[in-house]
């Protein structure tokens, strides 16, 4: 294997195998777009398989699903930071969705803690959601207002679920997933990671 081949990411090599470049020989731009999209899908599939494979082997599947779904529920409208490198994204995902559930799986919470925590989360959604990135600026003030409103409604719905669920440990895991999303939209996180905040201002 050549040094060049060894340095090519696995996802890119798989995309090359799955897409016939000959079919796109008259449309190089189209080929690159399709290849990039396929690479993103392959990266996410491999990351998903790794995270949930480890969760399954370690007996943390339910805990991982709880934290992950809580995180995704709020992220749908509040957006937030993404890791800039695939390896970093994978490592962060393992820490968030495998290590954190392992650490907090037996930590119970009561409804007073739930109310206090989600009051803090709701405040952050009001102040900072939605948060964009350099690669995905959220353009349009009305669009951002709509996303903020939906993010806050989503937070209230998740609060209700956490209050009503009868398992004290599950309440904790829901809060952990939600707090991870709060971290990803907080401007302090952007500052610490030296990432640009309010990227839409560059286009408006």
From Swiss-Prot:
GO MF terms held by the record: peptidase activity
Any Pfam family the entry gives: AgrB
Membrane-topology annotation of the record: Multi-pass membrane protein
Localisation: Cell membrane
E.C. number: 3.4.-.-
Gene Ontology BP terms: proteolysis; quorum sensing
GO cellular component: plasma membrane
Chief localization: membrane
Protein keywords: Cell membrane, Hydrolase, Membrane, Protease, Quorum sensing, Transmembrane, Transmembrane helix
Entry's transmembrane regions: 52-74, 87-107, 111-131, 156-176
Recorded family membership: Belongs to the AgrB family.
Alphabetical list of HAMAP family matching this protein: AgrB
Function: May be involved in the proteolytic processing of a quorum sensing system signal molecule precursor.
Protein name: Putative AgrB-like protein
Organism of derivation: Listeria monocytogenes serotype 4a (strain HCC23)
């Amino acid at each position: 294997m050549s040094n060049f081949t060894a340095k090519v990411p696995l996802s890119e090599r798989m995309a090359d195998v799955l897409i016939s470049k000959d079919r796109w020989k008259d449309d190089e731009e189209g080929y690159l777009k399709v290849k990039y999209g396929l690479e993103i899908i392959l990266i996410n599939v491999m990351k998903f398989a790794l995270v949930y494979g480890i969760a399954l082997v370690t007996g943390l599947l339910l805990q991982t699903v709880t934290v992950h779904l809580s995180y995704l529920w709020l992220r749908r409208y509040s957006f937030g930071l993404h890791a800039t490198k695939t390896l970093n994204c994978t490592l962060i995902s393992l820490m968030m969705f495998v290590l954190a559930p392992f650490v907090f799986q037996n930590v119970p919470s009561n409804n007073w803690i739930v109310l206090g925590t989600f009051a803090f989360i709701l405040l952050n959604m009001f102040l900072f959601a939605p948060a964009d990135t350099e690669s995905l600026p959220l353009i349009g003030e009305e669009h951002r207002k709509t996303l903020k409103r939906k993010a806050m409604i989503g937070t209230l719905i998740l609060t209700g679920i956490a209050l009503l669920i009868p398992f004290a440990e599950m309440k904790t895991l829901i809060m952990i997933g939600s707090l991870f999303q709060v971290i990803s939209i907080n401007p302090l996180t952007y500052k610490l990671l030296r990432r640009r905040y309010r990227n839409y201002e560059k286009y408006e």
